[in-house]
């Protein structure tokens, strides 16, 4: 029996995004303008920051590859089966899961999404040389171009919604710092102080962003 290389798991419902649809549309409009200028048929993001920036899903690698494919008419994350349906629920776009049944199924999934592309943008500051060679193998007719610096410049210009998120993050950090001071006492172990501070911040994040995924709690 031949096991599948890719599959889809759409259990549950899409989770409300932290940023508005208008905010996300502006990001994709900017990235697709870049694609137009550089004559790219698609982009494969692989870094934590860009996948989170464009899809709202923050992955934990578990030794596996993750990606986000952006074309002129599609947004699709490529994730490991270990995450199940969470990337689809959290992400703003589609989701394609690769299985562990065969080696390098991640690249089979990328091939499925980008087959026929003449030019694809990738992140040279994150993509390993080994993985770049594997991409060239599954997409032999495709040229690859580095878009990491240009996309970084896009992320540096903060919107009002992003500034508001940064302010909230700073306020949460202040609350955590105050909790740390409150817990300080002679003979109290450092790990207890850190745990109290972290727990206080997690509670505050949950209050401010009730639909968020809290790291290390799922």
Please describe what each predicted stretch is:
Residues 1-176, 200:
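A composition/biophysics-driven feature that prefers long, compositionally simple stretches
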Residues 154-218:
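Internal metal/ion-chelating core segments
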């Amino acid at each position: 029996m031949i096991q599948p290389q890719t599959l889809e798991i759409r259990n549950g419902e899409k989770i409300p995004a932290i940023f508005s649809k208008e905010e996300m549309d502006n990001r994709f409009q900017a990235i697709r303008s870049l694609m137009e200028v550089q004559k790219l048929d698609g982009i494969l993001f692989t870094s934590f920051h860009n996948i989170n920036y464009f899809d709202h899903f923050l992955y934990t690698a578990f030794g596996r590859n993750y990606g986000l494919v952006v074309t002129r008419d599609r947004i699709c994350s490529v994730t490991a089966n270990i995450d199940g349906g969470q990337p689809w629920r959290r992400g703003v776009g589609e989701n394609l899961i690769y299985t562990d049944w065969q080696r390098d199924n991640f690249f089979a999934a990328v091939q499925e999404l980008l087959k026929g592309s003449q030019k694809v943008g990738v992140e040279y500051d994150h993509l390993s040389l080994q993985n770049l060679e594997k991409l060239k193998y599954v997409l032999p007719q495709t040229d690859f171009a580095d878009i990491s610096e240009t996309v970084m410049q896009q992320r540096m210009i903060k919107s009002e919604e992003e500034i508001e998120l940064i302010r909230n993050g700073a306020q949460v950090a202040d609350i955590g710092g105050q909790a740390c001071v409150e817990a300080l006492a002679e003979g109290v172990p450092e790990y207890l102080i850190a745990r109290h501070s972290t727990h206080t911040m997690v509670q505050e994040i949950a209050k401010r962003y009730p639909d968020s995924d809290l790291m290390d709690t799922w």
